[in-house]
Amino acid sequence: APDYGLNLNRLDIPVNPYEVFKCDVPNMSTLLYFVVNDAFYNKALPKAQLPEGVLLGSLKDLSQQHPELVQQYYGKLADTSKDGITAFNTAFAQDGFMLYVPKGVVIEKPIQLVNILRADVNFMVSRRLLVVLEEGAQARLLVCDHAMDDVNFLSTQVVEVFAAENSVLD
């Protein structure tokens, strides 16, 4: 079996996905964001303004900036006692992506999240996606997964989606 590395020391992965990667969806204009391996790429972000109150970005950063909000949802749907992969992901996930849309807020433009696997050696990635839409909120989220290198990747991803009454997530 391959020996997979895990980026526990949070070494920087040298890539600017906005310069080297295109994931075009025909006839759709999106707000484009990236997760490189397991880390939200925040060195360059779309210029578009999100509606007031919307939180979008690194799960790690948002858990530090809004701990009460993240604690309210993180790990509430992902049952680690019944699923070994979910338990593994929960133990090793260090970052990922979070989208929070407050009550009644509508994000007009679709959000495109591209998960990129990038490494020079066999690599293991555990990332988490957390999406929360409060009552009456609306968003469209397109998630794409791509590998940039010709090495073996072992990836786990757990997605938790909370959609309150009358909210819409496409």
Residue ranges of predicted features:
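Glycine-rich and polybasic anion-binding loops at the starts of cofactor/ligand-binding domains
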Residues: 1-170
